[in-house]
């Protein structure tokens, strides 16, 4: 830690430093226990893991029960509370709101009254990367992601809403290429 932040801390004496994200995970610098939903900013503040009291703390992640199993997030709570602050404008205050945080593990967060009520994690980016790089579909796709083909993306979303199931719809990326009905960037966008 000192190798990374020692100079910064020395240059800013007395300024508190909050660390968020995987730094508080089991694989991080120190494990900060999860705070349970529902949770507001004050709940998070009460559960800070102080490494140097009053100076340096790790922000806890959050946990909730989602469909009968535990779900967790670390770091995204800082984005959510920032968004909740922005939503305090007239006509937007309170809630409820659903905030979507796209990424490797996308989060759909339910908020109400300035609190995070619960959330669901989806392995969107990670699944895309695995399919894109290590499945039979990889050979059909361009080596690098290019610009989004919005029409192909919309077609993929529309197909996902039809009967047949996710795995069948994923295989259709291959068959569309085999029958020259789509190729390249369109396939990647559809996927």
Regions found by a protein language model. Give the residues of each.
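Glycine-rich phosphate-binding loop plus the immediately following alpha-helix
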Residues: 63-93, 97-98, 102-163
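Short beta-strand-loop/turn "lid" adjacent to the catalytic site in phosphate-handling enzymes
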Residues: 8-73, 113
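Short, intrinsically disordered, charge-balanced linker/junction segments flanking boundaries
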Residues: 3, 37-41, 46-51, 178-190
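Generic structural "secondary-structure junction" signal
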Residues: 25, 31, 36, 118-121, ...
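Short, well-ordered amphipathic alpha-helical segments that serve as non-catalytic structural scaffolds
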Residues: 1-9
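Residue-level marker of positions within ordered structural domains that often coincide
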Residues: 6, 24, 88, 136, ...
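Adenine-nucleotide phosphate-binding core of ATP-dependent small-molecule kinases
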Residues: 159-190
């Amino acid at each position: 830690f000192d190798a990374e932040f020692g100079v910064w801390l020395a240059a800013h004496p007395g300024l508190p430093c909050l660390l968020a994200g995987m730094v508080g995970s089991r694989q991080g610098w120190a494990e900060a226990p999860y705070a349970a939903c529902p949770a507001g900013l004050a709940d998070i503040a009460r559960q800070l893991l102080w490494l140097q009291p009053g100076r340096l703390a790790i922000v806890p992640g959050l946990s909730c029960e989602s469909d009968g199993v535990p779900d967790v997030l670390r770091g995204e709570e800082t984005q959510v509370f920032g968004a909740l602050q922005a939503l305090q404008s007239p006509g937007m205050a309170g809630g409820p709101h659903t905030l979507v945080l796209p990424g490797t593990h996308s989060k759909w967060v339910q908020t109400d009254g300035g609190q995070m009520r619960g959330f669901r994690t989806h392995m969107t980016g990670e699944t895309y990367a695995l399919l894109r790089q290590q499945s039979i579909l990889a050979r059909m796709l361009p080596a690098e992601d290019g610009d989004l083909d919005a029409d192909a993306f919309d077609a993929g979303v529309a197909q996902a809403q039809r009967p047949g199931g996710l795995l069948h719809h994923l295989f259709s990326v291959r068959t569309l290429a085999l029958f020259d009905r789509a190729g390249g960037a369109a396939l990647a966008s559809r996927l």
